Amino acid sequence: MKTSVVAVAAVLGASALVGMTVAGCHSGSTSSPASSGSAASTTASSSAASSSAQAQPADYTELLIKATDINAPEVFTAGPPMQNPNGKAGVATSFSNPDGTHVIGDTILVLPDPSAAASALDAAKTALGGSVNGTPGPADIGTGGTTVSGNSPDGSKSVTVLLFTQGRAFTTLEFDGPANAAVPPDFVTDVGQKQVTAIKTGLPD
């Protein structure tokens, strides 16, 4: 399953933010000297905790909407979910109609906090031009809702992108279809609102 250019840009932006946060924590931290035995114990405990976290990554599948949430004339079918797209905490999937002419990509990144999610959204906004020709505008979906609709840069298909955050989750919804036939705004709003509800339920603040 292909992850959208917009979602990838958000991942890169979030990575930079997390890197700066970690670096800042290390450079500004002070601690009293500890005995070598205590340090070794702390290191061992940290390593064990890290190994445990890596062995049991979080499954965010329940944050996704279901195919039955998509109210359309045709039946949409969900593809298999992708855990941790591009190596970042979260989940992604796609929904398509029977002949594959309409596809909805749904990518949710779970960040450390709402501020990091907002930064990921800002990074994604700068990459919108790589996916769709159009002027972004506000959308009353989640926090910082932004939408843009038009044809893809090569003119081969219509693309509508909806970006928003909900708590510490950042979501990219991309609606692809035939060229010059963008999906109706109310359809985008309906899917977006259902995705907000699913995140609120599965990832409480």
Can you annotate each of these PLM segments?
Residues 105-107, 168-177:
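Short, well-ordered beta-strand elements
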Residues 111-115, 141, 165-167:
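A short, structured loop/turn motif at beta-sheet edges
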Residues 20-24:
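C-terminal motif of bacterial Sec signal peptides marking the signal peptidase cleavage site
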Residues 92-121:
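A short acidic-to-branched-hydrophobic micro-motif
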Residues 69-85, 118-162, 197-205:
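Short Gly/Thr-rich strand-loop-strand
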Residues 2, 25-94, 178, 185-205:
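N-terminal "mature-domain start" segment
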